Swiss-Prot record:
The gene is SAP9. GO terms for biological process: defense response; negative regulation of translation. One of its GO terms (molecular function) is rRNA N-glycosylase activity. It comes from Saponaria officinalis (Common soapwort). It comes from the Eukaryota. The keyword rRNA-binding does not apply. The keyword tRNA-binding does not apply. Pfam families: RIP (PF00161). PANTHER family: PTHR33453, RIBOSOME-INACTIVATING PROTEIN. This is Ribosome-inactivating protein saporin-9. It catalyses: Endohydrolysis of the N-glycosidic bond at one specific adenosine on the 28S rRNA. The active site is at residue 176. Keywords: Hydrolase, Plant defense, Protein synthesis inhibitor, Toxin. Gene3D superfamilies: Ricin (A subunit), domain 1, Ricin (A Subunit), domain 2. Ribosome-inactivating protein of type 1, inhibits protein synthesis in animal cells.
Amino acid sequence: VTSITLDLVNPTAGQYSSFVDKIRNNVKDPNLKYGGTDIAVIGPPSKDKFLRINFQSSRGTVSLGLKRDNLYVVAYLAMDNTNVNRAYYFRSEITSAELTALFPEATAANHKALEYTEDYHSIEKNAQITEGDKSRKELGLGINLLSSTMDTVNKKVRVVKNEARFLLIAIQMTAEAVRFRYIQNLVTKNFPNKFNSENKVIKFEVNWKKISTAIHGDAKNGVFNKDYDFGFGKVRLVKDLQMGLLMHLGKPK
C-alpha cells in the first residue's frame, strides 16, 4: 500500500501543495487525457485498491484510507486514550482483511465498523453542525483546522461528533483538493489559517462526476461544445474550472 504523508508540525503552503500533487500523481493514468486537456485522470481499477494518507503531528499520527479508483474515504486509524491503535471503517467500502493490509498497526480485534455511511450527508448528521445550513460548509477549511480536528481523535476517547468533523475536514483537504485545484488554491492562499468555506466549494464537490462527464464527452481542445453551469455561473472554457483530477470514464471520446 502506498503511503503519502503530510507533516502538520510546521507545514508550509508549498509542502501542502506538494502533498496534494503527490496524491494526484499517484492515482492518475499518465496516458489518459479527456477533452483535449492535460488534466489528470484517475487510472482504471487495479489490484492495488487503497492509498494511505498519514497526518503527522507532534502528538502522533492519524491515518486515512482512500480508494484509489475514486478517492472515497474508506477508513481511518488513530490511537485511543490508552495508546491502542484502532481502525474505524465504512463496511460497504472495505473488508476486515483489506483493513489489516492498509493499517497493519491495528489488530482485527481493534477494527470497528462505523455506525454511519461514507456519504457527506450521513457524516454531517453525525458531526452535529448547528450553524447555518448545518452542512460541512459551516466548519470552514484550512490547515490549522485540520490540525485541531485531528487532535480531537488522536489519543482520545472516541467521540462520534469529533470523529465526523475530523473526517469532513480531512476528506476535503485531501480528496477534494486533489480533484479541484480551486480548493487546493484556497487552502494555500489562506495558509495556514482557517477560512470560511463557500457555496462554490460545495458545488464543485457535489458535481465531480458531472464535470468529469462533461469534459470527457462534450469538450474539444479544452472548450465545451456548449455553456455548462455547475452551480456557479456559465462555463465554456474547461480551464476556468481549475480542475485537478477527473473521474475515470474509460477511453477518451
